[in-house]
A protein has these predicted regions:
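Hydrophobic hinge/microswitch elements
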Residues: 68-73, 77-80, 87, 152-198
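Short beta-strand->loop
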Residues: 96-106, 158, 192-206
Length: 234
């Protein structure tokens, strides 16, 4: 067994032990699941998909922690949550993971927002006010990586506003305070209502994975996988 495999096994054992101790301390008669989700998934994707699981497991208690990818990975590693749904990048070789969905990542503006110039590519937007999530957020990391590929960065923009909440960002964009980049799933309702508009860019096309992750070889894996199978169905 190589040292990295051994380290992963030890980490899983320690995390499982913490989870078991927590369950014993609660002394619950009903089963419980404690998991995490990043903001876009937790607010806009999972709520619509939880119905089936809740109906089939009416005795199960659920706790969903909504945090950014970096924080969820720390919580998973330490046994504070059993599994996570993340939109950010993570070391795939370190975890057991499965694809939840693929989502389009888009630029949007308010319907009455006047762009500084005619826009065709990402560089045409740098004179705008950019409203983004905080560092450590999966949503922001996707944007940073996409920009790097065309030699741009968040600091290329004229003005930057950082907000740690998707709803607040959408409100500011609806009120024409700037533009933002987010997952289509997070803005679908506002786009359909005509409150937000997609900014078409010929050089910026991102389709990104939302993934379900657990520690390798967890004793709870079968229970976690059953939950995933249920929410995998739209």
């Amino acid at each position: 067994v190589c040292s990295s495999d051994l380290a992963e096994k030890v980490r899983t054992m320690v995390a499982d032990e913490k989870m078991i101790r927590g369950l014993l301390k609660q002394n619950q008669k009903t089963p419980s699941l404690r998991f995490g989700a990043t903001l876009t998934i937790g607010e806009f994707l999972l709520p619509q998909r939880l119905n089936t699981y809740l109906q089939e497991h009416s005795q199960t208690s659920l706790t969903m922690i909504v945090e950014n990818t970096a924080t969820l990975l720390q919580m998973l590693n330490s046994g504070d949550i059993g599994f996570a749904f993340v939109e950010g990048y993570f070391p795939k070789q370190t975890y057991d993971w499965q694809l939840l969905s693929q989502e389009r990542y888009i630029a949007v503006k308010g319907k009455d927002y006047n762009l500084q110039k005619e826009v065709h590519c990402l560089k045409d937007l740098v004179q705008e006010t950019l409203i983004v999530r905080e560092e450590g957020s999966g949503t922001r990391e996707i944007l940073e990586r996409g920009m790097q590929e065309i030699n741009l960065s968040i600091s290329s923009f004229e003005r930057i506003i950082e907000i740690g909440n998707v709803q607040a960002i959408k409100t500011l964009v609806r009120n024409n305070q700037g533009i933002t980049f987010l997952y289509e799933a997070a803005a679908r309702e506002e786009i359909e209502k005509g409150e937000l508009e997609v900014i078409d860019l010929y050089d910026f096309h991102i389709l990104h994975e939302f993934n379900y992750i657990t520690l390798k070889d967890s004793v709870f894996k079968q229970q976690y996988d059953a939950f995933f199978a249920s929410v995998q169905r739209p």
